[in-house]
Amino acid sequence: MKLSRRSFMKANAVAAAAAAAGLSVPGVARAVVGQQEAIKWDKAPCRFCGTGCGVLVGTQQGRVVACQGDPDAPVNRGLNCIKGYFLPKIMYGKDRLTQPLLRMKNGKYDKEGEFTPITWDQAFDVMEEKFKTALKEKGPESIGMFGSGQWTIWEGYAASKLFKAGFRSNNIDPNARHCMASAVVGFMRTFGMDEPMGCYDDIEQADAFVLWGANMAEMHPILWSRITNSRLSNQNVTVAVLSTYQHRSFELADNGIIFTPQSDLVILNYIANYIIQNNAINQDFFSKHVNLRKGATDIGYGLRPTHPLEKAAKNPGSDASEPMSFEDYKAFVAEYTLEKTAEMTGVPKDQLEQLAQLYADPNKKVISYWTMGFNQHTRGVWANNLVYNLHLLTGKISQPGCGPFSLTGQPSACGTAREVGTFAHRLPADMVVTNEKHRDICEKKWNIPSGTIPAKIGLHAVAQDRALKDGKLNVYWTMCTNNMQAGPNINEERMPGWRDPRNFIIVSDPYPTVSALAADLILPTAMWVEKEGAYGNAERRTQFWRQQVQAPGEAKSDLWQLVQFSRRFKTEEVWPEELLAKKPELRGKTLYEVLYATPEVSKFPVSELAEDQLNDESRELGFYRQKGLFEEYACFGRGHGHDLAPFDDYHKARVLRWPVVNGKETQWRYSEGNDPYVKAGEGYKFYGKPDGKAVIFALPFEPAAEAPDEEYDLWLSTGRVLEHWHTGSMTRRVPELHRAFPEAVLFIHPLDAKARDLRRGDKVKVVSRRGEVISIVETRGRNRPPQGLVYMPFFDAAQLVNKLTLDATDPLSKETDFKKCAVKLEKV
């Protein structure tokens, strides 16, 4: 084939444009590209939210050049959201980090020095000295790690092993503490096992969708497209949306409900009362499969013990409960009448009744969806428990088309943070550090001395901030997260500890984020398909991908960093003599040898990889590291209701939902005929509980930790927007996404703006008791707050909204309430 230079250039342009848009490449263009190097396509899960969309990644000449929705992926069926289409560009920001950077002055580390390029050996030298000094002088409780629901499964597993087994410190927590911890505790309290019982297949079979504090139109747009299709193609399908402000999901709602912040607890109890008063209980299900318990109340707000609210609490942090009778439960919810609920919530009575009728109608299959509106809540665990009550009263659970479903916001908040157990209190497969039997199981599988894993729960995310500020936590490693921007109360509780000269802060990240720039040492990190990985999404799907390109410069994966750093420590440097005496054969070995190069982990040869398959980590070692770690980890859940398939199956299949038993995935847990752990004749079995029964909790309304008053007269709610993901550290480096939403704005009701002499586009100072930021007034647009509330996204590093937020948490889950604090506005 002969082409002129002009035709050649034109064909190249056509090929590039088609690839970027996920379109088929025209024949002439395909032929021209083929003369250079054909685009190679391989599957991967999307890098962003917890939906778990499948994408096809196109690589050419060592770079990711295109991305399209995977038509064979059952989650998204070939469709991407706007962020998914621009995945290639998140990897190639102009300020991508390519070498370690240490604060230095006069050739040495200095807390006040300038960031200076160093080698990896030099970086590990400094880290080794800081870790060993802290461990020797103050012990394991003086070191900590803050990880991520964006870690791959084996990265989270490796991190947990290093800290809990190697360093003997449970001071490791993921950023999922800020988003999913309330869901975890809610699941564990009600069902005894974590994660949803249903799946996305419910969407096409449901009669009604109820969104509790979830703007799925922007935060889970692919799932929302499926709900939209269901609603618009079936006039009998109903959508109800509850929120403290109006957002894009309201555009589809048949019943759009705006309620006073914190009063969702009242609505939930009202619906339970309605179900009982209208004889809508599924008596057969209820009598066989449910227990009733009354929970402790007045449990505080997770603030420092010296805070007046904590001093005033009668049962601070109490998770206690006691059995109660049905008559007592009936009397408890009877207080939440229609009249009282309307008064406390500000919701019209007819809307409340319409909502309650959805749950009470035995012929309607209902799905309840929620995300941060429930979870980022000082009574987030209670909110989770109370929505489960509605499904347990009516038996609308664990069957196609109906059930409660907690959506996740990160790609592996489920698969890594929760299932692997990277929380400060957890171990793999729902085990916990406080349980001696669970610790014993881990120690035996890891072949480490009995008593190695501490029984004491480590510091959770907010407690880590406080310990850094107080000088109790002195070496702190943050990976795959931007908590300096994303965490609460930056001014009072985070920045002081990070910049305290007693402390040494390490941040591993691909970009110079707010967190990285506040650190002492920055480690350049490989991202997404620059490494082999695995994520677990919101519906228990585990998804694998292969390394498809190499990371730029000296950037290394989080797994590489963890494993290489472990070589710097011998067992006698981190374990006391009494432990070594139990396993003297481990004396003199490095943590690398004990944790990551065991016969169990290293038994899979690198020859299992295709000759042309990239896998920098495994080829460096000579064994298939990811496979070894995964198979060791997977053995914790097999036979215990958390069964994962063999490693190789995930590379062959698009996705598999656990438990995977005899090669078959599970769509609906806990019900006969769907779940292999429920025997014939049992009907339902909530086997996370010893008696196989789920729990309905009686839990009351309790007020927020901070509410508007005469001086700080507005509620502030924070969150996200469609175009940006979390702190924007990836999406703001995509020019198209940045242009679409270049800076954060303050969404405000027009009358609230007018009362303060503010107009759309004006600069405004937003002030709380903890800090202030300058933003831009927005009285129109996608988010429409009611009078008395303002909404501000947190993606903008130039407008750190978390200078304003309060570090109050749910006392049970330790998850921060980012949705409710009090602010005032000042015109600039």
Swiss-Prot record:
Origin: domain of life: Bacteria
Reactions accelerated catalytically: 2 Fe(II)-[cytochrome] + nitrate + 2 H(+) = 2 Fe(III)-[cytochrome] + nitrite + H2O
Keywords associated with the record: 4Fe-4S, Electron transport, Iron, Iron-sulfur, Metal-binding, Molybdenum, Nitrate assimilation, Oxidoreductase, Periplasm, Signal, Transport
Predominant localisation class: periplasm
CC cofactor note: Binds 1 [4Fe-4S] cluster. Binds 1 molybdenum-bis(molybdopterin guanine dinucleotide) (Mo-bis-MGD) cofactor per subunit.
Signal peptide positions on this chain: 1-31
The name this protein goes by in its record: Periplasmic nitrate reductase
Residues annotated as binding Mo-bis(molybdopterin guanine dinucleotide): 83, 150, 175, 179, 212-219, 243-247, 262-264, 372, 376, 482, 508-509, 531, 558, 718-727, 802, 819
Cofactor section: [4Fe-4S] cluster; Mo-bis(molybdopterin guanine dinucleotide)
Subunit structure comment from the entry: Component of the periplasmic nitrate reductase NapAB complex composed of NapA and NapB.
Matches recorded under HAMAP family: Nitrate_reduct_NapA (MF_01630)
Stored InterPro entries: Asp_de-COase-like_dom_sf, CT_Nitrate-R-NapA-like, MoPterin_dinucl-bd_dom, Mopterin_OxRdtase, Mopterin_OxRdtase_4Fe-4S_dom, MopterinOxRdtase_cofactor_BS, Periplasm_NO3_reductase_lsu, Prok_molybdopt-oxidoreductase
SMART domains from the UniProt entry: Molybdop_Fe4S4
Molecular function terms, GO-annotated: 4 iron, 4 sulfur cluster binding; electron transfer activity; iron ion binding; molybdenum ion binding; molybdopterin cofactor binding; nitrate reductase (cytochrome) activity
Entry GO terms, CC: membrane; nitrate reductase complex; periplasmic space
Residues binding [4Fe-4S] cluster: 46, 49, 53, 81
Description of post-translational modifications: Predicted to be exported by the Tat system. The position of the signal peptide cleavage has not been experimentally proven.
Keyword Metal-binding included in the entry's annotation: yes
Residue numbers binding substrate: 794
Domain 4Fe-4S Mo/W bis-MGD-type, first and last residues per copy: 39-95
Known EC number: 1.9.6.1
